[in-house]
């Protein structure tokens, strides 16, 4: 997934000079416990909180997912497998998907990407704009200003996100003091992700005291040695 980086920068909240770089496979699976013991939860949370996700765009699929070595030694390309699975399941191609949403289809590769190099690369792979796979088309779409991904994916995201919330009784009909207790409702009203993190990991306080949304990248704390 383009959001997942290949490499991670591990920071120390109490030592701005310490910066270690780890590849995804260095901290994935069974290796994760050793990484947690080595750096501790506070520094790992700080490192992940200050990191930025990858852009949802072409040429940004993680390298390790394209050359993933399984436990049996077989190397697989998950990017190619995703395309193959979509085709096997009958997922509509990009233009047909747009039409099913009552949206105008792309008339050409240039119309899809607004990028001449990307359009040429797509033309080298696909015989027609109608052949472009949905995932490829979604990654090729230029996002509107201020958006993290293109118009087509955003429309589906809005539908799915709102449906998940509206279909969960604990967010709707049972979001009441009777279900959560008055004390529970007070905790919900007076806390957010930042306060939850700081309550369990107090050393994160300096990194989060100005953060209004802990799910967005946090600011990196300045190095006192370089401040004047």
Model-based region annotation:
Residues 1-228:
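Terminal regions of secretory-pathway proteins
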């Amino acid at each position: 997934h383009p959001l997942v980086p290949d490499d991670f920068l591990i920071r120390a909240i109490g030592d701005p000079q310490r910066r270690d770089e780890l590849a995804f496979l260095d901290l994935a699976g069974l290796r994760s416990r050793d990484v947690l013991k080595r750096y501790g939860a506070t520094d790992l949370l700080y490192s992940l909180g200050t990191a930025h996700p990858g852009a949802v765009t072409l040429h940004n699929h993680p390298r390790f997912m394209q050359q993933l070595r399984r436990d049996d030694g077989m190397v697989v390309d998950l990017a190619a497998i995703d395309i193959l699975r979509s085709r096997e399941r009958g997922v509509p191609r990009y233009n047909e998907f747009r039409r099913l949403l009552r949206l105008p289809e792309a008339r050409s590769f240039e119309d899809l990407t607004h990028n001449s190099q990307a359009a040429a690369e797509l033309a080298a792979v696909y015989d027609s704009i109608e052949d472009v796979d949905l995932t490829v088309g979604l990654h090729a779409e230029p996002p509107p200003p201020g958006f993290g991904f293109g118009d087509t994916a955003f429309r589906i995201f809005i539908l799915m996100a709102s449906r998940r919330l509206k279909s969960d009784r604990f967010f709707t009909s049972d979001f009441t003091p009777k279900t959560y207790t008055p004390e529970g409702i007070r905790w919900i009203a007076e806390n957010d992700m930042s306060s939850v993190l700081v309550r369990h990991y107090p050393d994160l306080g300096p990194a989060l005291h100005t953060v209004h949304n802990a799910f967005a990248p946090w600011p990196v704390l300045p190095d006192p040695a370089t401040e004047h």
